[in-house]
Regions:
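Concave beta-strand-loop units of leucine-rich repeat
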Residues: 4-13, 27-41, 50-70, 76-90, ...
Length: 276
């Protein structure tokens, strides 16, 4: 579904949005956004039983959505994107049996998203791809979720230990250096694609962290450590020397990138390493 335009919004405002989704998600999609009063309830969507894609975007600072009741009647809904939701409305997520992809939280605005209890998300039967934007997230609340893709744009994660229970998790993205206790659980995870790239302003986010567990991920195929300034040459050599599936490596603007010529990258299909 692409180039979706929703017209005749309240107040005569035309609103447009590109919705990028799986090509198998055919026609029915709704995008709700604009400069009018914030959306607080989605109850009326119970009448849209053929709806497959729904994206709701409120203004920055808008109050959380208080009512998701009605979404469970959208039996064909596969892709859902919503900003912050009140804790009292979270149980409805557990009833959304058809949703495959969920994007939760105001994109890039961590403070605006309520992430106090995400346990209802683990009960979504078809959920495979989950994007979360918020402050501190407790991954133990997602225990039991059969995820393939997990993207976390959050302030703090704490322990990555629950990832070891996600046996089918293939892609993990940690956006802009969330606080993490240790990378150690990654060594026992099923992750094949790991994105930990940082912005220039967050280059030292993991300056006190041990990257060694990243060298102990036997299923790892693709790794992006762009701007992880303290990822050093010795650790990178260990990563490349280990018997892993690694084929794609991005270490741009890291300490290791300064010594790129010393690295044995012959087995890689793609290697990106501009020096700082």
């Amino acid at each position: 579904v692409g180039d979706l335009i929703v017209k005749d919004a309240p107040g005569g405002v035309d609103i447009g949005r590109n919705v990028n989704s799986n090509e198998q998600l055919a026609a029915c999609a709704v995008s709700v956004e604009g400069t009018y009063d914030p959306v607080t309830s989605l109850a009326d969507l119970r009448h849209f039983d053929s709806l497959q894609v729904l994206s709701v975007n409120n203004r920055r600072g808008a109050p959380p959505i208080t009512d998701l009741t009605g979404l469970e009647e959208c039996k064909n809904l596969m892709l859902l994107s919503v900003p912050s939701v009140e804790s009292s409305a979270f149980p409805t997520f557990a009833k959304l049996d058809s949703v495959v992809e969920l994007k939760y939280g105001s994109d890039g605005i961590r403070a605006d998203s309520n992430v106090s209890d995400l346990s209802a998300l683990a009960q979504m039967k078809s959920l495979k791809m989950l994007w979360i934007t918020g402050s501190e997230v407790d991954l133990t609340q997602l225990a039991g979720a059969d995820l393939r893709v997990l993207r976390l744009d959050v302030t703090r994660i704490g322990s990555l230990e629950p990832l070891k229970q996600m046996e089918n998790l293939s892609f993990l993205q940690l956006c802009q250096g969330p606080e993490i206790d240790s990378f150690a659980p990654l060594a026992e995870s099923s992750v094949q694609y790991l994105s930990m790239s940082l912005s220039q302003g967050a280059q030292e986010a993991y300056k006190d962290m041990d990257y060694t567990p990243l060298t102990q991920m036997p299923q790892l195929i693709w790794l992006d450590l762009t701007n992880n300034i303290t990822f050093d040459t010795e650790t990178c050599k260990k990563l490349l020397a280990n018997d892993t599936a690694l084929k794609y490596l991005k270490i741009s603007y890291t300490s290791a990138a300064k010594d790129a010529e010393e690295l044995d990258t012959a087995h890689l299909k793609e290697f990106t390493a501009p020096a700082p």
